[in-house]
Amino acid sequence: MIQPGEIQSIAGKGGVRDTQIEKDYVISWVMYGIANNLFLKENLVFKGGTVLKKVYFPDYRFSEDLDFTFTGKDFDIEAIKAAFNKLIEWVYEESRISLSVQNETQHDTGNYNFYLSYTGPLGGAGANKDIKVDISQDELIYNAPEEKKIINTYSDLEEKYSIFCYSLGEVIAEKMRSIMQRTAPRDIYDLWYLFEVEGQDIEDHVFAFQDKAKHKGYDPNKLIKVIEQKEKTFAKHWKDHLANQMTEIPDFNDVWRELGKHWRKFHKFIE
């Protein structure tokens, strides 16, 4: 385990709270544990906002959850629990980070989530000292998962390790689908960043989005209508939902306007 001073130094340079860096550090060790657990590495595919930070864009917004799609033949929750218990033991032996599983939930869809509470370099348990782990088994994966190296900046994680991850296109298509399911400002931010900053072309991801939406029972042709209906809610929660994940939050109105041209391009493409 690294010293508190290393956490505080990184936090100071990045202009974020030391507890945010500690959580990112613990997430890195959990990922290292997955890479060293044969069952988890073979059956879990890393996805969501955290994969953008830990695999594709090291300076990206921080994310506090770990999201995976299970790709094994049998979604055996007891086997998943057993594998995570082994991971917890391994991480403690290697780093002295204490982890424990809390608040397990199995949903009607069969999906499984729990929280990993932790004691890291900054010491004892406190508010928000946990990481939500969500494992879904009802997702359609459009593109083949890719084995990717995890990005790390911590002194005790210099060894390179990799796990299976969503392709960038898969992340985009699922983010578009997620907007139809929930109202999370991070989805809007992520899509804006990927289209506007990284130059991704929405037309390249339309077919994957359509398949993913239909798979969950949504009409992909209603995407823009759904987005427009949620504008006020996105705007209301824009700053408070993103404040813990980045130091400079772009203006919502600018983001909304710039995303508009991508939605228009999407609409023209599907006509």
Give the residues covered by each predicted segment.
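Structured mid-to-C-terminal alpha-helical surface segments
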Residues: 1-44, 54-60, 64-66, 70-271
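Glycine-rich beta-strand-to-loop/alpha-helix junction loops that act as flexible
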Residues: 46-50
